[in-house]
Amino acid sequence: MLNAEDKKLIQQAWEKAASHQQEFGAEALVRMFTAYPQTKTYFPHFDLSPGSDQIRGHGKKVLGALSNAVKNVDNLSQAMSELSNLHAYNLRVDPVNFKLLSQCIEVVLAVHMGKDYTPEVHAAFDKFLSAVSAVLAEKYR
């Protein structure tokens, strides 16, 4: 699915985003909750207002998991296994939500990376986030 050039583009782009995990993650979550309000049902115990400590903390976790995925791009299933178990068996998150969050992450990256978020980077990230979403949904089968 991901070729060598895709992996290179993902790693280069992620180097620019990695130091902004909390900020970008929180922004992606707020975008998701705004664009897809049904996703709020998975967070009944959270203060969902933009900038809340819970949103910022979870945003950092989400992008931290993506950092792990970038580092382990050739072994996503093993790297994301624990997270897949958590979302499938404990949290019971509908897998469609992974795609919704992926879209929001792509928007945040595009906004903040500007001209560095080229069509090639976009295509590589789209494939990468699709692969991550598929791995997270593996345990549902």
Swiss-Prot record:
Q: Tissue expression, per UniProt?
A: Red blood cells.
Question: Which residues are in the Globin domain?
Answer: 1-141
List the GO biological process terms.
hydrogen peroxide catabolic process
Q: Which InterPro entries match?
A: Globin, Globin-like_sf, Globin/Proto, Hemoglobin_a-typ, Hemoglobin_oxygen_transport
Gene Ontology cellular component list: blood microparticle; haptoglobin-hemoglobin complex; hemoglobin complex
Q: From the UniProt record, which GO molecular function terms apply?
A: haptoglobin binding; heme binding; metal ion binding; organic acid binding; oxygen binding; oxygen carrier activity; peroxidase activity
Q: Origin, by domain of life?
A: Eukaryota
Where is heme b annotated to bind? 58, 87
Pfam families, alphabetically? Globin
- Gene3D superfamilies, A to Z: Globins
Family statement = Belongs to the globin family.
Q: What is known about what this protein does? A: Involved in oxygen transport from the lung to the various peripheral tissues.
Q: State the oligomer form and interacting partners.
A: Heterotetramer of two alpha-D chains and two beta chains.
Name the PANTHER family for this protein. Answer: HEMOGLOBIN FAMILY MEMBER, HEMOGLOBIN SUBUNIT ZETA
Q: Under what name is this protein listed?
A: Hemoglobin subunit alpha-D
Q: Which gene encodes it?
A: HBAD
